[in-house]
Amino acid sequence: MRQIAIYGKGGIGKSTTTQNLTASLSTMGNKIMLVGCDPKADSTRMLLGGLNQKTVLDTLRSEGDEGVDLDVVMQRGFGDIKCVESGGPEPGVGCAGRGIITSIGLLENLGAYTDDLDYVFYDVLGDVVCGGFAMPIREGKAKEIYIVASGELMAIYAANNICKGLAKFAKGGARLGGIICNSRNVDGERELLDAFAKKLGSHLIHFIPRDNIVQRAEINRKTVIDFDPESNQAKEYLTLAHNVQNNDKLVVPTPLPMEELEAMMVEFGIVDL
């Protein structure tokens, strides 16, 4: 069982990428569980035909510890993928990161991590790598980390910060598997992300071009793999899935100092001095 966490700046398309990646892997015959670790609880919606399933934390609040059953918090979606949303605390109360810790512990106790699973994916909010959001890394749950980024300043800044957190918790066995570029059509984007990944000691595992079919699929409450499996964009996600499945380059990243990061952004024309 490979346990993989997908991190990335909010709004980067992390959940869309993760759902299309897991859908692609399922078409290759893999058995998968996807755990949404984002308070927005939108990590599995396209796999479930637009269903907003009940989150683990909402269920705990309404039913208590004794009232939670696995079939209440876990739904099966496209490709028979097991879908779970950890959810978040009530607004203004508690810590969303702690919710991830609670959810994963509950899933373990309920026997969700079955031996037949090939992959468990964690879709994690990644603007900050505080203790709770780092939990899949820190506790050694996820051994492989992929970061979704683009050629925009804040996306790369967030990716670099995530690598700082990953390097800190590397003794638990977690490694960076690569950078996934979810393109924003920025000039020189592929070259920038390739250079950034190499400076981290890693690689650009795939460049996903921008395509409006992603939005059309989401309007129809489906992944691209489900909506139009013969499309060019579906082939891009399938290539990503093959690259992840065959990836053996797992490293402890070397995050860039801020001066070097800014110099690289200037070199590629992303920011002006």
Curated annotation (Swiss-Prot):
NCBIfam families xref list: nifH
Family statement drawn from the similarity comment of this UniProt entry: Belongs to the NifH/BchL/ChlL family.
Details of cofactor binding: Binds 1 [4Fe-4S] cluster per dimer.
Residues annotated as binding ATP: 8-15
Function: The key enzymatic reactions in nitrogen fixation are catalyzed by the nitrogenase complex, which has 2 components: the iron protein and the molybdenum-iron protein.
Post-translational modification: The reversible ADP-ribosylation of Arg-98 inactivates the nitrogenase reductase and regulates nitrogenase activity.
Positions of [4Fe-4S] cluster binding: 95, 130
Stated name of the protein: Nitrogenase iron protein 2
A Pfam family: Fer4_NifH
One Gene Ontology term of the molecular function aspect: metal ion binding
GO terms classed as biological process: nitrogen fixation
Entry annotated with the keyword Metal-binding: yes
